């Protein structure tokens, strides 16, 4: 699978027309809306709205000035607007199943959980301090499946790890991980990511090698 999702802006607009009706979806038999099952009085109730976006960015949504290195180094949750999208190029260090989260109504079914892709600048800089998390969500995965594109965790794992890619999607700052990110907790012994900045959800992936 050389090109997972070609013709960037054309297909963004094409797929946008197919992304209606995703406010509430069935995850393992559970009707899960864009807030997931978060408590309305908790911060994740609002944050889940951003995690569960399913509209595809159009050209005017993109901030071409934001780079992968910017996301790696930023510990400032206000540095970038999360209503903007980015296009990034990097090396895929790892692909794995996301955890059990309120955004997906705490489903344990792997088919309905996020896919975490660990993106680094290149194959020489793959330590946790360089890893930016970019995520495929169940809603976007479903839209892709309708178009005949397989964005399951297993498919992405088998095709992306060890390759250079171009990805695009919405910016997100996942404040829940401040204690595990080098940009906000430089001395953390259990850090596993560069910063809290993510691309979440991803709406485009293309293999470059």
Task: List the predicted regions and their residue ranges.
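OB-fold and OB-like single-stranded nucleic-acid-recognition modules
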Residues: 21-209
């Amino acid at each position: 699978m050389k090109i997972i999702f070609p013709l960037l802006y054309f297909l963004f607009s094409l797929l946008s027309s197919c992304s209606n009706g995703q406010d509430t979806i069935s995850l393992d038999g559970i009707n899960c809306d864009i807030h997931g099952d978060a408590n309305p009085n908790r911060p994740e109730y609002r944050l889940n709205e951003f995690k569960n976006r399913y509209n595809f960015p159009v050209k005017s949504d993109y901030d071409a000035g934001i780079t992968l290195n910017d996301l790696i180094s930023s510990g400032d949750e206000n540095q970038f607007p999360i209503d903007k999208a980015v296009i990034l190029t990097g090396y895929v260090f790892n692909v794995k199943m996301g955890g059990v989260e309120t955004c997906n109504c705490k489903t344990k079914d792997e088919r309905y959980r996020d896919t975490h892709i660990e993106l680094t600048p290149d194959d020489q800089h793959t330590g946790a301090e360089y890893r930016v998390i970019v995520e495929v969500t169940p809603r976007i995965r479903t839209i892709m499946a309708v178009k005949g594109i397989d964005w399951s965790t297993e498919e992405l794992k088998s095709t992306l790890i060890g390759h250079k890619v171009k990805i695009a999607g919405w910016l997100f700052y996942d404040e829940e991980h401040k204690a595990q990110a080098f940009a906000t907790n430089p001395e953390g012994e259990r850090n596993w990511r560069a910063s809290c900045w993510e691309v979440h959800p991803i709406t485009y992936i293309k293999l470059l090698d």
